[in-house]
């Protein structure tokens, strides 16, 4: 035991002897790193997957910053990001962040959690590193050095470092997938969010000519405002809109209401109204918006004069990170606040143009949805939150569920899928009269088909990789584990002579695993668009990474499911992973479990039977969700 302790002490002492610690968090600093490392006795620490990968490819010895954090640290970072993102609720600053009774600070929370998780993780890593190497000089980017100034006086910036690395906002830097062409002759590419927004505005201008019902609504009719709904995804809902006395108004600010022939036809046949910026904007509104921006600029100056509050609130484990975060956050909030003035005024005008009986949203997290919730409360309009994905029905997953806007904290009614989520909501203390299990429109056309069922052409892998808003997901271990999981599935299906199709999760940040698949088998097909249900219908087996809604799709379609565990978020185990409706496995057991499901009919049939039972618990009114949704809205008004 004494020898082991001495060895640890020697290793620790060796670590302290490095003259320079190079903090490598941006591949744009690679040239500076090469020059610095070649001249001095130094230790290199990478801070994300990209920097780790390039150092590994160049065979440059280095450590990863994750090594300085424990799982407990990662959980604490996540919890702190959630709590700090609630800064806007503090009484001392509340009078400076309201505009027309809408809390502007609350509108950035969803994006801010993403920013904070990444930032706090780096802050705590640098703090731990500074304590480990007390005698060393730290060399790094402007971003790293700005933070490290709080922990060490011995810092040197890379000569050519640029500040922009730390100032890219998640929503602004998102690349939007665009597809042009026809079904069998098309190409997909990604464009910036700003370009997408401009193209969206141009595409919406002809809507009043293409959709004659816009602006021809009866004054006393009952109107439902539907916010951020995709017509193709909610096809059966849109198909049934015309068969009711309700008038539906679609208001999509993040995505266009229609973008191709199919979505246009659905909108037209639904007889709904499309409202856009172009249909609401005029010279009077323009003046109101300009005046509002002038007003809020003054309030923002007063807001950030509360230095002591921000210094105290923006802290982690007793360590304030406000001094390094201040400039970024001030500019960020000002930018978003000015953008929100226009959005608030547009939505206010829309809500004055029609008398809405209720409002339908898919999440409480989005900025436009939060505006609607706050403006609706002023007008006493009930808001209905429609569950839009399978959720972690666990106590451990509560904070994450709230952050994602799937818990009805502000909505008047919660339209959930079925019994399991209904019971979970009650356990959270949500009143029974607020919860309504009505099924889900997207599953209306997901049904067992004997002809397609018998095809069993391939194994289907549904990816659901690490996100950028969870501290554990940011670690190299989880990122590489996800890639290794995909590679392992490719290798095993090839080994067993099975065709493999990989369906990529629709998130814009999702890894495209084409390069992994090609390394193993060039015949593996990777699909990154379209619905997954038709693919499940013809597959022999679905392999889902972790817990995802596609498990329910497969249960409904009578397909066996393997859930391959990759991430470690601490969200607990949801019912679907405990009720034997799918075979839960990991990388070590995957080979044996895959072989069993493919070759043992008894195991396969039992999984299918359990899956069918689970789907009945998760989803009420199967194949009838749209009718139940419309029926509920009719009764509500």
Annotate each language-model stretch with its function.
Residues 1-637:
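Catalytic-core helical/loop segments in enzymes performing group transfer/polymerization on anionic/lipid-linked
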